[in-house]
Amino acid sequence: MAAVDHPASSLPHLQLLSDLTPPSLERTWLTAPHPRLPIVATCSSDKTVRVYSLTNFRLLSTISGGHKRSVRTAAWKPHVQGESVLATGSFDATAGIWRRWDSYGQTTGDEGWGLGQETTTNKSESQEEQAQETDILRQQQATHNENDGADDEDEEWRFAVLLDGHDSEVKSVSWSPSGMLLATCSRDKSIWIWEDLDDGDNNFETVAVMQEHEGDVKCVAWHPVEECLASASYDDTIRIWREDLDDWGQVACLRGHEGTVWFLSGPRIVSCSDDRTVRVWRRQPKEQAAAGGTGMPSILRPTGLDETWEEETVLPKVHDLAVYAVAWSKRTGLLASVGADGRIVIYEERLGVVRTEWVILAVLPGAHGIYEINHVAWANRADRDRDVSKEEEVLVTTADDGSVKVDETVGL
């Protein structure tokens, strides 16, 4: 019997839903999906954060005035009722806390948040410095008002707290699962943990400063459930941190990447690197670790280590240049990666009788034209008037040209 040719459209692929408009005219670093609303916050070199609707893909609000240089990172605080709380990190070496009441979010107009609506470049250190200098020159030019009538909304964002302590650019911010702790990391090689005292006066207290990394710390990420922190660095390592008797310390150091580790994500750990690889790491049960486990040679065991992590797999290699970001879907378990080659790659884990295998489901080359893609995130959205329970998951990517694109997965 002759083989049946399936039309290309029937194969698993990514399909562009929309660009978020209007975009920033400068480099966009990262997109942070809101934990419960169909909105995202994007971080730009023009010192602003833009908040967009994933229902109609339009700009809802522009947050500005808190940082003196590029906004590199942002994260929404979880488990907040009645308002949205956003943490930001900037090249000006500070982190900021922004607040906005959500009471108007139940409206049905396009302006509402309502649920039923609407790095580097082998970004090596020298290249990242050059990018930062370019950002500064751009910021000295005339600023662009892209708010499209959102000025009234902008006034409702309150710059509540400035967290000052790092000596250099803040590269990543991340809230703990409880929302009571905020981790920040910096080019100064340090990781800070701040506690939200939740006293009604916007007070934060520094509870730990960790300086074991030997290079720029690119990313921090919390375990989805436990108060366990992972960090990734220019020193090619991933480090795991826990609190013991009110003292935070390193409990594991993962080695295996042969270049800067840019990003971390997921319930296990998925990491990506300058070495063009994406790797998955798994924590061994304590009983197995105590018995000796498999003794992966890529794992160092610092003094007092109470956890053993092993490299579970290296995903199929697709990227030709540095991989800057990975995202693990909570809904489907799919992984997405992006990087300097402009590709979006989707991977799926397939459980076999003997071993687990990761396969490539889709590759979208040139997703942002000739530009490098700095970040990728999975986000939930629903069309206007659609039942929220039927919301879909989309992929949001940000790039050097300032564009933010929303893709849907077809046949995945």
From Swiss-Prot:
Endoplasmic reticulum listed as a keyword: no
Gene Ontology cellular-component annotations: cytosolic [4Fe-4S] assembly targeting complex
The keyword Repeat belongs to this UniProt entry's keyword annotation: yes
Leader sequence segment: none
WD repeat positions: 20-62, 66-108, 165-204, 212-255, 257-291, 318-357, 367-407
Region annotated Disordered, chain positions: 108-154
Keywords linked to the UniProt accession: Repeat, WD repeat
Pfam hit, one: WD40
Domain of life (superkingdom): Eukaryota
Biological process per Gene Ontology, one example term: iron-sulfur cluster assembly
HAMAP family the UniProt entry points to: ciao1
Family: Belongs to the WD repeat CIA1 family.
Protein's job: Essential component of the cytosolic iron-sulfur (Fe/S) protein assembly machinery. Required for the maturation of extramitochondrial Fe/S proteins.
Protein name in UniProt: Probable cytosolic iron-sulfur protein assembly protein 1
Source taxonomy: Eukaryota, Fungi, Dikarya, Ascomycota, Pezizomycotina
Name of the coding gene: cia1
